[in-house]
Amino acid sequence: MQSNAENPRKRFTATSPNGNRQNVSVDTSSNVAGPSRPRIANAVPAEILDDPALNQAIKSILPSNYNFEIHKTIHHIRKASASCVALQMPEGLTLWATGIADIVERFTDATTVIMGDVTYGACCVDDYTAMALGCDMLVHYGHSCLVPVDQTAIKTLYVFVEISIDPAHLAATIRANFPNDRHDFRAKILGGSQSAAGKRSEVDESAGRAQIQIGEQASVASGAPPSTLTHLALVGTVQFINAINGLREALRQQQHRLADGQIVSTESPVDRLMLTAGTASSAPVQHITQAAKWKAWSSGEYKVTVPQVKPLSPGEVLGCTSPKLDKDEIDAIVYIGDGRFHLESIMIANPRIPAFRYDPYTKRFVRELYDHAEMRRMRGEAVRLAQDSVGGLDLDPETSIVKKNKAVVVDAEKDRVTASGWGVLLGTLGRQGSLRVLESLSASLSEHVPPIPHVPILLSELSPQKLGLFGEHLAAFIQSSCPRLSIDWGSAFAKPLLSPYEAAVSVKKVKGWQEDVQGLGMSRTPAKQQQDGNGNGSDAVPAEDKHLPLDGDYPMDFYSDTSLGPWTPRHGMAPAKKPVGAKSNLALLRSLRSKRAKASSTPTSAATA
């Protein structure tokens, strides 16, 4: 079900079998134990949901395809008896900030404050500033609950702002472009039968030439069940989580497209005779002309995965946090959202899986590429420059593994005096700064031999001009605000700007990443070749190193509960894994309810007998 401002999702509203809302009551007259009923303490009252004035205000002020959850917001403000409410949202939603403020002040007794500072993500929730302004409640729009509500300084309500899109067009776009057979997908979409290592077989040069085939014959061939289903991983921003779940269900069932363009989910109808594009020989089709592309409809089911990296929602990715996928299982990543910032995160974490982006606003579907080798080289160079400022360490240019120099440092005191200091930047924009990360970084620098002098610096936003004011006194900087600042903009700074992970690599707390390796970015061309002494070609690019963390890939796990080390804010917060064969909490709850249901039916059966 699509949700919008006129028809908000009533996830906490109880309904009767006929669809009418009603109060839920528990019958306590019976002494027979039965399944417990869920509490609905946060249910939005009917007088708010059905308020004609409120609904008219929402309809006239806010866009219908954006769900700002106004009813729930009004309910929570009234319930908390809030007197001053702070509204915080990213710049893309600021257009409606004044309208939301007017609605809140009209239908509650609270005043509002619009927080105009830049909001890059969920890490920027600014409850401390809101409290300093005298607000007793904060409504944060557009991001997930990265900072739990029980850890904020004042009462905080997160509104994801789910955006309604065209689900039929989204599913049809996938089926019209992606064969559901893995071999056909790799041949037609990736340009050959490409392995996870980046090697491919040659593509038939005659694939682009069209041949007339009879529709009945083509349908017989296309109707054959695939040997292996195309495996897609669906991800996106939090605004499109519902769209991701809907797409998953649509791709897990058969959908047929008739000659007139109509899409049905029933059994495949009898195809009319039609002209289709094919090859001049009996070889399988490798490329399809644009005119006949819509006829390459894949009506079968796909294998679909919606990955999750906790504490994020299933399918959700952040610019700094994305799941690590199995490159031998996943054939493609499908990202739903506009822009590349969040998509690049999962591309960096999974460089050997091709990525495609569906823009729900323009309805364009494109393949996105990323220069992994260049990024890794630049970040490796930044680590080496930082190491050179203190000496005693070097970085292997091929594997980026930190190792000791051959020259042994004898006079550690001299090195300690001549070594340049490092600046450790703690972000103060919202909740970006983490004292836990600062303590971990400071301890790593102090434990280094020789110890690296460092000074903590508090900054809300970084810029080359701001850090340039420190002159030559600091040789390198470590910033804990966002890893993407170092990855995307590190080259713009005069001194190395390391992320916490890169700092850990530089002081030998963890082995690093490989800079140039086979298969990065699923390149369509074979790996680079070089001539050996005998004139024979040999691979100049090494294979991935299984002995390195994440097989030598660059991690994107900054807010993951299962991150690599203590240089991330939530390291070690993942719950302990259950023993093999142990039941999950959900399974135990279902088992308990089943036992209660059986116990409640036993006396009735005995009385009847």
From Swiss-Prot:
Needed co-factor(s): [4Fe-4S] cluster
Annotated [4Fe-4S] cluster binding sites: 123, 320, 482
Entry EC no(s): 2.5.1.108
Organism: Mycosarcoma maydis
Top-level taxon in the UniProt lineage: Eukaryota
Stated name of the protein: 2-(3-amino-3-carboxypropyl)histidine synthase subunit 1
Biased composition, class Polar residues, residue ranges: 13-33
Assembly description: Component of the 2-(3-amino-3-carboxypropyl)histidine synthase complex composed of DPH1, DPH2, DPH3 and a NADH-dependent reductase, predominantly CBR1.
Cofactor: binding details: Binds 1 [4Fe-4S] cluster per subunit. The cluster is coordinated with 3 cysteines and an exchangeable S-adenosyl-L-methionine.
Entry keyword set: Cytoplasm, Iron, Iron-sulfur, Metal-binding, S-adenosyl-L-methionine, Transferase
Keyword Transmembrane helix: no
Protein location: Cytoplasm
Catalytic reactions of this protein: L-histidyl-[translation elongation factor 2] + S-adenosyl-L-methionine = 2-[(3S)-amino-3-carboxypropyl]-L-histidyl-[translation elongation factor 2] + S-methyl-5'-thioadenosine + H(+)
Regions that span the bilayer: none
Gene name tied to this protein: DPH1
Region described as Disordered: spans on this chain: 1-37, 521-547, 565-585
Main subcellular location of this protein, as a coarse class: cytoplasm
Function noted in UniProt: Catalyzes the first step of diphthamide biosynthesis, a post-translational modification of histidine which occurs in elongation factor 2. DPH1 and DPH2 transfer a 3-amino-3-carboxypropyl (ACP) group from S-adenosyl-L-methionine (SAM) to a histidine residue, the reaction is assisted by a reduction system comprising DPH3 and a NADH-dependent reductase, predominantly CBR1.
Pfam families: Diphthamide_syn
GO cellular component: 2-(3-amino-3-carboxypropyl)histidine synthase complex; cytoplasm
Entry's Gene Ontology BP terms: protein histidyl modification to diphthamide
Pathway where it operates: Protein modification; peptidyl-diphthamide biosynthesis
Family per similarity comment: Belongs to the DPH1/DPH2 family. DPH1 subfamily.
